[in-house]
């Protein structure tokens, strides 16, 4: 099955609607070969790799083979820097404290220390993060960790997917830090 990725996917209603539809369209795929065609794709906001990665992970758990085709050099660079490309290729570029990316990762709830270390190094210790007190950092870390815990308790999920992006060239600068789980929804609970 060939799936065409649209020209631009952003963190807005259209972007999230696209991924919801992609999830629905592929929900019955079992042991298939899925080609994600990026020929038309010029931009996918890095933080949305958490959503896309969760969908791909679900597909792989159901025995599907995943491949990306026609990925532009620009998109390959984005996917390489945030380690998202590791899902389909064996590439591992270092992510440094100077990087604008918060690399893609998948966590299991029992990885509490890893989750906290990730948030600390990928978000709170980045040079692009505004100067804040140690107490503020501690409170932010606690609040973010609570999101992980709530997803597992209320969502009955075992995995959390994360990715993010600093947009330091915008005025004012901002960051998107995305958490995704595929557990039970608020409506279901």
Briefly describe each language-model feature range.
Residues 102-131, 187-189:
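Helix-loop-beta hinge of the Bergerat
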Residues 175-189:
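Glycine-rich/acidic phosphate-handling loop/turn and adjacent ATP-lid/helix
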Residues 48-66, 71-82, 87:
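N-terminal accessory interaction module
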Residues 132-165:
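Conserved ATP-binding N-box helix of the HATPase_c
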